[in-house]
Amino acid sequence: MIEKLQVIEEKYLELEKKISDPEIISQPQEWQKLMKEHSNLQPIVEKFREYKRILDTIKEAEELLDTDLDEDFEKLVKEELNRAKEQKEIVETQLKILLLPKDPNDEKNVIMEIRAGAGGEEAALFAAELFRMYSRYAERKNWKVEVMSTSESDLDGFKEVIFMISGKGAYSRLKYESGVHRVQRVPVTESGGRIHTSTATVAVLPEVEDVEVEIREEDLEIDTFRAGGAGGQHVNKTESAVRIVHKPTGIVVTCQDERSQHANRDRAMKILRARLYDYYQSIQQKEIESQRRSQVGTGDRSERIRTYNFPQGRVTDHRIGLTLYKLEQILDGELDEIIDALITHFQTERLKEIG
């Protein structure tokens, strides 16, 4: 590991020289590319330098203990040595995590799809609350939220909502939200005051560039129809709504929220591209997973990942056994505590797999 880190540090120093070279600065594209590479290596190099400082501290303390010391000073040196050894183990693990292969999608924007599951109107209201939760989280991160498609229920819930979140590292933080979210509470539609369980399914897809997925025109069946609002309001007089069927996979995308057919088609294609990318990736993933046997907690859509219990004010993430009594704060977008714990868990699992 040390040799690998030394090579990375040398590369980092080389990049440092290049990005301050006037000739490179005069080539914006090249300079930007090198800057990105430099900032990707920075956290590893900084952690490696911290690690080297700890090794120096250990060496100095051990050398001191080989000399004649008075009792009090020896005790202090031993304490410092123990602290440094503990710190060395922590930083070693952090370095191993930093050296893990990066998910190529981590820096991408995300397309999120939330669908009401079991529970009728109550599930649709819960889907709307999840949409608000992710929107508030995006606000906290200074990310941008753009609604792409909605299907509303009678009580202003969502049967389905598709939206894009754009911002640095959006996919790296939100990818663990894929799966079935469950709510336990007394529904507004329930007069008897009994607790009901409803569900909503969340899918998190990285935004995909045109070049990453090839879509052939002959594989598409495109229909247009008149868009209609909830309860027949704002009915469009022209056929601006678009439905696209990808014949080879059977994936269907409908968009009707935009005023023009052209804008709805663009949005539908963006969603289709992301779904196809996800579809082909999941086929690939299944092949890999069948060779490995650790299929728990990887964001399978059919897997129940989290429960939001209103009577107890509790949120439990079942994949990592984490329970927090912070329901209100979490639904208001304070998701970092859960997401950080999930990232740590899955990174540790990957370290075990690598061995």
From Swiss-Prot:
Record PROSITE patterns: RF_PROK_I
Keywords on record: Cytoplasm, Methylation, Protein biosynthesis
Keyword Protein biosynthesis included in the entry's annotation: yes
Localization terms from the record: Cytoplasm
Domain of life of the organism encoding this protein: Bacteria
Positions of modified residues (N5-methylglutamine): 233
GO molecular function: translation release factor activity, codon specific
The UniProt record lists the keyword Cytoplasm: yes
Post-translational modification, as annotated: Methylated by PrmC. Methylation increases the termination efficiency of RF1.
GO cellular component, one term: cytoplasm
Pfam families according to UniProt: PCRF, RF-1
Chief location category: cytoplasm
Alphabetized Gene3D superfamilies for the sequence: 3.30.160.20, 3.30.70.1660, 6.10.140.1950
Free-text function comment from the UniProt entry: Peptide chain release factor 1 directs the termination of translation in response to the peptide chain termination codons UAG and UAA.
Family named by the database record: Belongs to the prokaryotic/mitochondrial release factor family.
Stored PANTHER family: LD18447P
Protein name, UniProt field: Peptide chain release factor 1
